[in-house]
């Protein structure tokens, strides 16, 4: 009835100064709280449980969504359940109590149920949404909710691991006892580890039955749990200890050199690619590295990597410095300088071929590429020198050291057209003068003939 009255007239339920004394919500910063807070705590899910329909999940309750808790739910305490009866029963229980391999007075289902209650009971009891005494109601609601179903999933995972552990123990028979320990069994040690300390975690060898190799340690450590699943590791360690120190072939437990992968070969090929005039040459080392690999490593050994030597051919670039002041004319013509450069480059290439050892196809390809790059650079230098020579022939750009190539071409075209026009003009004048000369010669001849 109070709820209906509040919904019909919300203003009457919210005076100016409202103060609720709720022990769960300490909101000092908010003097006016929403009207849907209740002074008394009521078990909403307990009322819904009595109905015939399935109660909604915790995340579907619209009223519980607006509850502003001071802090989120705390993480489950691992020390709170150490003294519970189920924990003591599991810790003191030894699966190998009987000779027939049974679980003593407890069946397999009872063992899994005790471990499930041990791992998931405290976490569920600490949640703020359910009654800790109502276990059936928790199972009906919490498992269906995506927010709280992690508890049941964790309990199911632990149950599956314990079942697989017991099955492996029964299949393998009696495990090999570890060195230095008498009659300790793997199962009893595993259950004793649960009651050792809350900060300790489950041994990884229980979850991962196969031993994990660590490259940093010289040899793996033998644990009581790992011997139950890897009986061959104990024999390998014992054989390694029994072998003398001076044996020529020691037992190699780990592979120091990783095998060559496809990515490594691709990187080597990319390094061998040559850009512009930089050539790459492979030199075989005088002595090959001998890598001794163990038979257990699978025969993977990295091939000897020949060092890559970068050689830069001496090419006369004659790059023009545009920022330099105007210099004097070159001593040698461009044609003579080109002959000297080409002769020097070809002589250097021939010397490299004579001094080198017999080459493979890759080395010959590198030589061809290097020769092509040298000739291409020489062609570019000749083209640059021709531009400079053309610039020196143009009167307007004769003293301009920073003239670009486009301006040189435009000015050269205009200058050529003007020179051609001047040539035509001079040719026509020459013809006129030649005719005038012919006329004067004829007149002079006539005057000589007329005089006695």
Swiss-Prot record:
Keywords: Acetylation, Activator, Chromosome, Cytoplasm, DNA-binding, Glycoprotein, Isopeptide bond, Nucleus, Phosphoprotein, Proto-oncogene, Transcription, Transcription regulation, Ubl conjugation
Practical applications according to UniProt: POU5F1/OCT4, SOX2, MYC/c-Myc and KLF4 are the four Yamanaka factors. When combined, these factors are sufficient to reprogram differentiated cells to an embryonic-like state designated iPS (induced pluripotent stem) cells. iPS cells exhibit the morphology and growth properties of ES cells and express ES cell marker genes.
Keyword hit for Phosphoprotein: yes
Residues carrying covalently attached carbohydrate according to the record: 71
UniProt feature, compositional bias: Polar residues: 348-360
GO cellular component: cytoplasm; nuclear body; nucleolus; nucleoplasm; nucleus; spindle
InterPro entries given in the database record: bHLH_dom, HLH_DNA-bd_sf, Myc-LZ, Myc_transcription_factors, Tscrpt_reg_Myc, Tscrpt_reg_Myc_N
Top-rank lineage group of the source organism: Eukaryota
Positions of modified residues (Phosphothreonine): 21, 71, 328
Annotated spans, Leucine-zipper: 426-447
Localization per record: Nucleus, Nucleoplasm; Nucleus, Nucleolus; Nucleus; Cytoplasm
Segments of skewed composition (Low complexity): 223-250
GO molecular function, a single term: protein dimerization activity
Description of post-translational modifications: Phosphorylated by PRKDC. Phosphorylation at Ser-342 by PIM2 leads to the stabilization of MYC. Phosphorylation at Ser-75 by CDK2 prevents Ras-induced senescence. Phosphorylated at Ser-75 by DYRK2; this primes the protein for subsequent phosphorylation by GSK3B at Thr-71. Phosphorylation at Thr-71 and Ser-75 by GSK3 is required for ubiquitination and degradation by the proteasome. Dephosphorylation at multiple sites by the PNUTS-PP1 complex promotes MYC stability by preventing ubiquitination by the SCF(FBXW7) complex.
Residue ranges of domain bHLH in the record: 367-419
Motif (9aaTAD): 113-121
PROSITE patterns per UniProt: BHLH
One Pfam family named in its UniProt record: Myc-LZ
Keyword Glycoprotein attributed: yes
Covalent cross-link Glycyl lysine isopeptide (Lys-Gly) (interchain with G-Cter in SUMO2) as placed by the record, residue numbers: 65, 156, 161, 311
Modified residues (N6-acetyllysine): 156, 161, 170, 288, 330, 336, 384
Residue stretches of biased makeup (Basic and acidic residues): 279-291, 328-344
Function summary: Transcription factor that binds DNA in a non-specific manner, yet also specifically recognizes the core sequence 5'-CAC[GA]TG-3'. Activates the transcription of growth-related genes. Binds to the VEGFA promoter, promoting VEGFA production and subsequent sprouting angiogenesis. Regulator of somatic reprogramming, controls self-renewal of embryonic stem cells. Functions with TAF6L to activate target gene expression through RNA polymerase II pause release.
Subunit structure: Efficient DNA binding requires dimerization with another bHLH protein. Binds DNA as a heterodimer with MAX. Interacts with TAF1C and SPAG9. Interacts with PARP10. Interacts with KDM5A and KDM5B. Interacts (when phosphorylated at Thr-71 and Ser-75) with FBXW7. Interacts with PIM2. Interacts with RIOX1. The heterodimer MYC:MAX interacts with ABI1; the interaction may enhance MYC:MAX transcriptional activity. Interacts with TRIM6. Interacts with NPM1; the binary complex is recruited to the promoter of MYC target genes and enhances their transcription.
Protein name (Swiss-Prot/TrEMBL): Myc proto-oncogene protein
Gene: MYC
